[in-house]
């Protein structure tokens, strides 16, 4: 799944190459997506490359190759300059912060179990968009939760495996906007991408740290990261 900005950039590159045979410059991509700096374009290109949508050609300036497009892409819809995407894969639109869930509800007479809404998926790997629909509810032990509002997310990726969090697990999150160093959090980056990582501080910056040596720690300015909740529990199904 691509975020809206990733889709916008992919389609902009594709349409420009169809028109002129040459990929757009980083400045052109920045202006087309209305981003403040070229660093945002670098991040989007890296994400598209990691997902297999584009390839950077070595030893050539501005050399990008579009490998594939979103399945629902319609070539009859042409982008305009400045440009909104013709396709939103999965019809997500622009991702928003994780919606505030309803309080957990008791589902047993003795109050030992509660129902928690599953709000979608969260990346433990390359950041993806958190899906904003309450897809279904799950029942968890009441003593797993404590106080506060909670929601669940299904994990996609392997960047937190050394913390015991695996692809396909369901994590239970206590809703909140603050975290202490070392907490595993749902972090929203640039109001665009959601990811599950360990929260650290590096001076005035925020570090989102993976629990897998294959992934680098990502450093952001404090205004670029919003904490959406902290990990309080995990559910795993064995097949």
UniProtKB/Swiss-Prot annotation:
The active site is at residues 159, 197. It catalyses: Hydrolysis of Ala-|-Gly bond in repressor LexA. InterPro entries: LexA, LexA-like, LexA/Signal_pep-like_sf, LexA_DNA-bd_dom, LexA_repressor, Peptidase_S24_LexA, Peptidase_S24_S26A/B/C, WH-like_DNA-bd_sf. Residues 84-107 are annotated as: Disordered. Keywords: Autocatalytic cleavage, DNA damage, DNA repair, DNA replication, DNA-binding, Hydrolase, Repressor, SOS response, Transcription, Transcription regulation. Residues 26-46 bind DNA. Gene3D superfamilies: Umud Fragment, subunit A (2.10.109.10), Winged helix-like DNA-binding domain superfamily/Winged helix DNA-binding domain (1.10.10.10). It comes from the Bacteria. Its EC number is 3.4.21.88. The keyword Acetylation does not apply. GO terms for molecular function: DNA binding; serine-type endopeptidase activity. GO terms for biological process: DNA repair; DNA replication; negative regulation of DNA-templated transcription; proteolysis; SOS response. The record marks 124-125 as: Cleavage. Represses a number of genes involved in the response to DNA damage (SOS response), including recA and lexA. In the presence of single-stranded DNA, RecA interacts with LexA causing an autocatalytic cleavage which disrupts the DNA-binding part of LexA, leading to derepression of the SOS regulon and eventually DNA repair. Homodimer. HAMAP family: LexA (MF_00015). NCBIfam families: lexA (TIGR00498). Belongs to the peptidase S24 family. This is LexA repressor. It comes from Rhizobium johnstonii (strain DSM 114642 / LMG 32736 / 3841). The lineage of its organism: Bacteria, Pseudomonadati, Pseudomonadota, Alphaproteobacteria, Hyphomicrobiales. The gene is lexA.
């Amino acid at each position: 799944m691509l975020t809206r900005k990733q889709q916008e950039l992919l389609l902009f590159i594709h349409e420009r190459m169809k028109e002129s045979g040459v990929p757009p410059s980083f400045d052109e991509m920045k202006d087309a997506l209305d981003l403040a700096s070229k660093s945002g374009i670098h991040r989007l290109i890296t994400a598209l490359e990691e997902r297999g949508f584009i390839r950077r050609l070595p030893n050539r300036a501005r050399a990008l190759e579009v490998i594939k497009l979103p399945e629902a892409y319609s070539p009859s819809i042409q982008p305009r300059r400045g440009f909104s995407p013709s396709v939103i894969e999965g019809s997500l639109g622009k991702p928003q912060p994780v919606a505030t869930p309803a309080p957990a509800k008791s589902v047993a007479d003795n109050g030992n179990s509660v129902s928690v809404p599953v709000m979608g998926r969260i990346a433990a790997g390359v950041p993806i968009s958190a899906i904003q629909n309450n897809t279904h509810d799950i029942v968890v032990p009441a003593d797993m939760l404590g106080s506060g509002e909670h929601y669940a997310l299904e994990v996609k990726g392997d960047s937190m495996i050394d913390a015991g969090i695996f692809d396909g697990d369901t994590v239970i999150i206590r809703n909140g906007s603050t975290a202490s160093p070392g907490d595993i959090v749902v972090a929203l980056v640039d109001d665009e991408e959601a990811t599950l990582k360990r929260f650290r501080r590096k001076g005035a910056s925020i570090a989102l740290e993976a629990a897998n040596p294959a992934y680098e720690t990502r450093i952001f300015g404090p205004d670029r990261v919003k904490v959406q909740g902290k990990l309080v529990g995990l559910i795993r199904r064995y097949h």
